[in-house]
Amino acid sequence: KGAGVAVALSLAAVTSVPALAADSIVQAGETVNGGTLENHDNQIVFGTANGMTISTGLELGPDSEENTGGQWIQNGGIAGNTTVTTNGRQVVLEGGTASDTVIRDGGGQSLNGLAVNTTLNNRGEQWVHEGGVATGTIINRDGYQSVKSGGLATGTIINTGAEGGPDSDNSYTGQKVQGTAESTTINKNGRQIILFSGIARDTLIYAGGDQSVHGRALNTTLNGGYQYVHKDGLALNTVINEGGWQVVKAGGAVGNTTINQNGELRVHAGGEATAVTQNTGGALVTSTAATVTGINRLGAFSVMEGKADNVVLENGGRLDVLTGHTATNTRVDDGGTLDVRNGGTATTVSMG
């Protein structure tokens, strides 16, 4: 800190660093091992910094440009095995790389470069901005990853966000996607929220985990988990295996869903599911106020415009025929329910 004038002059060439409390620069080709940043200290990394502990840079709130202090990884810079703790901030700029970072207790990582194998614990946060790539992030209890428009997260493992129950609002935990998320694994208590502009591809959801779709979800596999498709949300090519549920709410749409044995597709009134494949033992739960088309073991089936035809109900499946609506050629097998409301009509019902 004694060479403050020289440090200040060097900062003229540094990208996106506030001109306050600049304390150390790791030059290209230089390696620094260990150390602590606090009290608005800055570390500007063009070379390599290993094993730093950061507890400054977020005093003015998460992901705020008004903050000063923290670690700044420049183009070509590398940070490894960093611990970011209370009020700490690591900024990874375009061309910079951070690996094996642990973020906890209210610390955060702002990412326009590359982050590999980040772990988010107790209120640790990662913000993936436009151009940023996060790969292999693990989100543990009360951790949070925000993938902004133009950001990419790949191989994320989500273990938090759904502790309050399926499809509930747990605020800033789990993963929220405005950009792109690929090859995500959602475990028990994990939640991925895909916002209107967001896209999620190749997601695996296990029992106790869920995905809330307001944007687009492609190629999701439900191995006991839940997928909720909300108004204006779209899910394509979902596979529902044992214990999995796909729930299509009013204004939501899904296409090419496959329901396997002990899986369940629920389509609410005003929801739409097209090109469904219902395999033996798969359950369809819907009403004549929804739109559902596809194939089952009887052949083509449909529910649309108040008319249901060739529907198979089994293993928890249910069809509600509403007032003024009709159902024809319905097959009700073990565990299936056909509920014809007052004023509804069902003809040619066969029982298993």
Describe the residue ranges of each PLM region.
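Extracellular beta-strand repeat scaffolds in secreted/surface proteins
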Residues: N42-V45, G69-I73, G88-V92, G107-N112, ...
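Short, T/G/N/S-enriched strand-turn elements that build extracellular solenoid repeat scaffolds
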Residues: S24, T31-E38, A49-S64, A79-T85, ...
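Bacterial Sec-dependent N-terminal signal peptides
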Residues: K1-A8, V14, L20
